[in-house]
C-alpha cells in the first residue's frame, strides 16, 4: 500500500454543514489561521505539503488566495482537460484520489497531504485505505448550509488527543468551537 497518508481538515457546524452558496457560512479568523498553519506547517524546510480539493472547492477560494500559498495545490475533477486550461501553472489536476496519490508518491518534497473538500472528496478520502486522520473543527452553533461533511463512523474513527492541538473551547465573537482529531482505526 502507498505510504501517502491522507489528513482531512474541515470546519463543520452543529448540523455538519461546511458551506452555503459556495462560501463558508461563518467568518472565524483564528479558525482560518489554524487551517492555514495545519496545511502549511512542515518539519523540514526543504519540504512542502499538498492540499487536495474538488473543483467546486477550488472555485470557492477567492482569486486572491488561489492557489493556496506554500502548498502544492491538487484539484480533482471529471473534466481534467477543461480545468487544466483554467488553473495557474503549478496547480495539478487529476480525475481522482488514486491519481493524486500516485503523483504525490513520485515527489520526494511532499511531507503531508491534506484533503480540504468538498463533500464528495471528503467521502472518498474517508473510505480510502490511505485515510489517516480527520482534523475537524466542531462549531457549536447551527448555520444554514447546502454542503455537508460526511457522517463520521465512530466504529472506524476514534477521537484522539494530539499534543499540538488545543483541546479547550475556542471562542470568536459569539461562536464557540473545538478542534477535534479523529484517527482511523
From Swiss-Prot:
Q: Which GO terms describe its cellular component?
A: mitochondrion
Listed Gene3D superfamilies = Dihydrofolate Reductase, subunit A (3.40.430.10)
The record's annotation in InterPro entries points to:
DHFR, DHFR-like_dom_sf, DHFR_CS, DHFR_dom
A Gene Ontology biological process term? one-carbon metabolic process
Q: Which reaction does it catalyse?
A: (6S)-5,6,7,8-tetrahydrofolate + NADP(+) = 7,8-dihydrofolate + NADPH + H(+)
**Any single Pfam family the record assigns to this protein:** DHFR_1
Oxidoreductase is among the record's keywords: yes
On the tree of life, the source organism's domain of life is Eukaryota
Question: Regulation of activity: what does the record state?
Answer: Activated by dithiothreitol and p-chloromercuribenzoate. Inhibited by trimethoprim, methotrexate, sodium tetrathionate and hydroxymercuribenzoate.
Binding sites annotated in the UniProt record for NADP(+):
11, 17-23, 55-57, 77-79, 117-124
Q: What class of enzyme is it?
A: oxidoreductase
GO MF term list: dihydrofolate reductase activity; NADP binding
Q: What is its EC number?
A: 1.5.1.3
Q: Which residues form the DHFR domain?
A: 5-184
Entry annotated with the keyword NADP: yes
Task: Could you list this entry's UniProt keywords, alphabetically sorted.
Answer: NADP, One-carbon metabolism, Oxidoreductase
Q: In which pathway does it act?
A: Cofactor biosynthesis; tetrahydrofolate biosynthesis; 5,6,7,8-tetrahydrofolate from 7,8-dihydrofolate: step 1/1
Query: Binding of substrate: at which residues?
Result: 31-36, 71
Assigned protein family: Belongs to the dihydrofolate reductase family.
Record's function text:
Key enzyme in folate metabolism. Catalyzes an essential reaction for de novo glycine and purine synthesis, and for DNA precursor synthesis.
Q: What's the protein here called?
A: Dihydrofolate reductase
Which organism is this protein's natural source?
A: Heliothis virescens (Tobacco budworm moth)
Give the source lineage, highest ranks first: Eukaryota, Metazoa, Ecdysozoa, Arthropoda, Hexapoda
Amino acid at each position: 500500500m502507498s505510504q501517502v497518508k491522507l489528513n482531512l481538515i474541515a470546519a463543520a457546524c452543529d448540523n455538519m454543514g461546511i458551506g452555503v452558496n459556495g462560501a463558508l457560512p461563518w467568518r472565524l479568523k483564528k479558525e482560518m489561521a489554524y487551517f492555514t498553519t495545519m496545511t502549511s506547517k512542515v518539519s523540514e524546510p526543504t519540504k512542502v505539503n499538498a492540499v487536495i480539493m474538488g473543483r467546486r472547492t477550488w472555485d470557492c477560494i477567492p482569486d486572491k488566495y488561489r492557489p493556496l500559498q506554500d502548498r502544492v495545490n491538487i484539484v480533482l475533477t471529471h473534466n481534467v482537460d477543461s480545468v487544466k486550461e483554467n488553473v495557474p501553472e503549478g496547480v495539478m489536476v487529476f480525475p481522482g484520489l488514486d491519481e493524486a496519490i500516485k503523483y504525490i508518491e513520485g515527489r520526494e518534497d511532499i511531507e503531508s497531504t491534506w484533503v480540504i473538500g468538498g463533500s464528495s472528496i471528503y467521502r472518498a478520502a474517508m473510505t480510502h485505505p490511505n485515510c489517516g486522520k480527520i482534523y475537524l473543527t466542531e462549531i457549536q452553533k447551527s448555520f444554514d448550509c447546502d454542503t455537508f461533511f460526511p457522517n463520521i463512523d465512530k466504529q472506524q474513527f476514534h477521537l484522539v488527543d494530539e499534543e499540538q492541538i488545543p483541546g479547550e473551547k475556542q471562542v470568536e465573537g459569539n461562536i464557540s468551537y473545538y478542534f477535534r482529531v479523529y484517527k482511523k482505526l
